[in-house]
Amino acid sequence: MEAYFATFRSPGPELLKVGFFTLRWYGLLIAFAVLIGLNLSNKLASIKGLSKNLINDLLPILVISSIIGARAYYVIFEWRNYSGSNFWSSIQAFGLTISIPTFIKVWQGGIAIHGALLAGTIAILIFCRLKQEDFWDVLDVLIPSVALGQAIGRWGNFFNNEAFGLPTDLPWKLFIPYPYRPEFFLDNNYFHPTFLYESIWNILLFLCLISLIRLSIKGKLKLPSGSLSCVYAIIYSLGRVWIEGLRTDPLCLGGVPPFCIGGIRIAQLISTILFGLGLLGLFWIYQRKKKLPSLGIIGRKHQ
């Protein structure tokens, strides 16, 4: 007997539609993740002794830059789907048909977490310099919320019927409707729920980071500036390299999905680099007993 209780099936990307207004699950999940992250980061910032309202001031810049970065990163590596005859698209609004570049339609999916991390990091760098805050302290305060936000946001992939893995008959398989299946797998009904794998992995990562913070508060562990961010880079990258190998829609360098034959999966490459940087960072902090490079950021003004 098939274990239907463990088979996933998306109800669709839209939660509510009234006239031209559409509330999508993905957008709702991102908003939910941002609110939770704001509350958590403010608490951690208070424990860290950072400036009051620092996170509140940073949040709008961080959210906007991360969304732009996530979309731009995806579009760059998938440009073949947004160029030529695919460059222009149309939307219906206020009874009008409006032509817009296709890459603007972010609500249809197509974002990459590594792009968000890159753009977000740059935004934090600039913000910290302007506010005279220590970059690594601020990043360490934010990083648990990043992990938790990723765990929540991955469910947006579930509702959008995207970012799923290779075909499988495992009890926890994910049903993908025919229109969403890759051309290579049109005859397959069930696929690995890679969104679930990464969501669970990120929850475990979040719990690990919070546990380290608690040990630090109790005086049982020293967490120098940047150490928490290095732990995130190591653990997240380990999971992403494995999970990315299952996906049917990877961003490829020198190849094409679903297998990137003749090329490499970008996410695996970036994750490998981040893993190495994370290890190097922890070695620098705990073995060399040195602070991580300041990256040109001025020290905290209230120290």
Curated annotation (Swiss-Prot):
Superkingdom as given in the UniProt entry: Bacteria
PROSITE patterns in alphabetical order: LGT
EC number in record: 2.5.1.145
Annotated InterPro entries: Lgt (IPR001640)
Keywords carried by this UniProt record: Cell inner membrane, Cell membrane, Membrane, Transferase, Transmembrane, Transmembrane helix
GO MF entry, a single one: phosphatidylglycerol-prolipoprotein diacylglyceryl transferase activity
Binding site for a 1,2-diacyl-sn-glycero-3-phospho-(1'-sn-glycerol): R154
Pathway: Protein modification; lipoprotein biosynthesis (diacylglyceryl transfer)
Region forming the signal peptide: none
Pfam family for this entry, one: LGT
GO terms under biological process: lipoprotein biosynthetic process
Protein topology in the membrane: Multi-pass membrane protein
GO cellular component entries: plasma membrane
Location of the protein in the cell: Cell inner membrane
Keyword Cell inner membrane: yes
Spans traversing the lipid bilayer: 18-38, 58-78, 107-127, 193-213, 266-286
Main location: membrane
Described function: Catalyzes the transfer of the diacylglyceryl group from phosphatidylglycerol to the sulfhydryl group of the N-terminal cysteine of a prolipoprotein, the first step in the formation of mature lipoproteins.
Stated family: Belongs to the Lgt family.
Name of this protein: Phosphatidylglycerol--prolipoprotein diacylglyceryl transferase
